[in-house]
């Protein structure tokens, strides 16, 4: 927070997505900063009902969230389907939340050279019947890269993100890269000009490393 208040660079936007229990207190504390708050997931139901333990997009909006991450690989691995993600995205948009829509291939799919096919399928299914994508940000996170310390080669990364952008005929959404981004490898990937930002996981838990990533990104 202190770094954000002192930093006058208007080029970057930081969205912090904490556990749901911290959204309200953080959104209040961050009101006078350029930091914004989002959620890590939401339930697909647009209305309240018998969904014990779940939090929908309306509830997240009411406690101060402006963004929500949907389609994260960890949730996909727990059985979340493209159809379910599509329902969640529609619900979030109706609640005026900006969606960070995660897509990416597994190691097996990469080895079989199916990356583009997988990405196309996830985009088509996840955004089915959604005409206005102005509140959607795509996060490309190769499943094999998350938490492993491995990142795609610059040329492969550039090609994948360019492919993602090519799937949108009208307004092209911002595309982030996520997958083992840290303060050591950021200098290697920040200059790939098709990347619009980063979805940072483990490295964001250390304020020192996170600030270092921001500084290196804009130097």
Where are these regions (language model features)?
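Active-site loop-to-helix "anion-binding N-cap" substructures in soluble metabolic enzymes
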Residues: 1-219
């Amino acid at each position: 927070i202190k770094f954000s208040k002192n930093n006058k660079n208007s080029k970057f936007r930081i969205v912090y997505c904490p556990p749901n229990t911290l959204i309200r207190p953080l959104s209040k504390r961050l009101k006078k900063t350029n930091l914004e708050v989002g959620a890590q997931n939401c339930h697909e139901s647009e209305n309240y009902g018998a969904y014990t333990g779940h939090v929908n997009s309306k509830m997240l909006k009411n406690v101060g969230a402006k963004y929500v991450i949907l389609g994260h690989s960890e949730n996909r691995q727990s059985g979340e389907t493209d159809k379910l993600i599509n329902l969640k995205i529609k619900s979030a948009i109706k609640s005026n939340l900006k969606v960070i829509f995660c897509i990416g291939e597994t190691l097996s799919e990469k080895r079989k050279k199916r990356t583009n096919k997988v990405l196309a399928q996830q985009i088509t299914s996840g955004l089915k019947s959604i005409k206005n994508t102005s509140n959607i940000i795509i996060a490309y996170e190769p499943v094999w890269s998350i938490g492993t310390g491995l990142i795609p080669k610059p040329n492969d990364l550039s090609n994948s993100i360019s492919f993602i952008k090519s799937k949108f005929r009208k307004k092209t959404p911002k595309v982030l890269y996520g997958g083992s981004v840290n303060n050591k490898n950021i200098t290697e990937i920040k200059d790939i000009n098709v990347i619009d930002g980063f979805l940072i996981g483990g490295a964001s838990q250390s304020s020192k490393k996170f600030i270092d990533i921001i500084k290196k990104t804009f130097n």
